[in-house]
């Protein structure tokens, strides 16, 4: 899995190649049943423009989190993008949303899938850098794209 983090831009980017067609990847990426396999079982996701997204996560030693937002772009089988706001239990939710985008493009032997998380610069002061760095760790620890790859390739 390729990972790049552009600290000056507060941009997180991961990419992986999956041995499957874009349509096969899309089936796992853009369905609740599919997402339950690789992202979370505590998930609400409405797969249409303006649709709601909400995910509950418990991170041992760190706390209980709710991530929520709405679908801003859905272009089968090329892109799924949604806003992302964090609410840690006992704290106020973020005042603004960031953006998470999954993009698919055919490769010679399958599909390149990228995950990009942007918009941290809209958060206030030190919160921007803290959340940016925390989300790099979070996406890596969750092995999000590796989990998607495993789910897609197992279904073939």
Regions found by a protein language model. Give the residues of each.
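Short, P/G- and charge-enriched loop/turn segments at secondary-structure junctions
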Residues: 1-4, 57-58, 88-91
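Hydrophobic ligand-binding cavity/cleft-lining segments
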Residues: 1-44, 48
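Aromatic-glycine hotspot motif
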Residues: 2-22, 72, 94, 105-114, ...
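Hydrophobic pocket/interface hotspot
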Residues: 25, 35, 53-55, 71, ...
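A solvent-exposed, acidic/Ser-Thr-rich amphipathic alpha-helical stretch
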Residues: 41-56, 60-62
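Hydrophobic-ligand binding "helix-grip"
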Residues: 43-46, 64-112
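Short, solvent-exposed aromatic-acidic interface loops
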Residues: 85-89, 116-123
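A conserved amphipathic terminal alpha-helix motif
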Residues: 119-156
């Amino acid at each position: 899995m390729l990972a790049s983090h552009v600290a000056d831009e507060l941009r997180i980017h991961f990419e992986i190649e999956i041995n499957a067609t874009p349509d096969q990847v899309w089936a796992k990426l853009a369905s609740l049943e599919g997402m339950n396999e690789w992202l979370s079982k505590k998930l609400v996701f409405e797969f249409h423009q303006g649709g709601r997204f909400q995910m509950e996560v418990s991170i041992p030693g760190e706390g209980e989190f709710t991530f929520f937002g709405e679908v801003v772009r859905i272009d089968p089988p090329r892109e799924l993008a949604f806003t992302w706001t964090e609410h840690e239990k006992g704290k106020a939710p973020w005042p603004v949303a960031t953006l998470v985008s999954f993009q698919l493009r055919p490769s010679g032997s399958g599909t390149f899938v990228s995950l990009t998380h942007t918009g941290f610069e809209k958060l206030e002061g030190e919160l921007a850098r803290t959340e940016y760095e925390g989300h790099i760790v979070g996406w890596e620890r969750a092995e999000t794209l590796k989990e998607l790859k495993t789910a897609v390739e197992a279904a073939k």
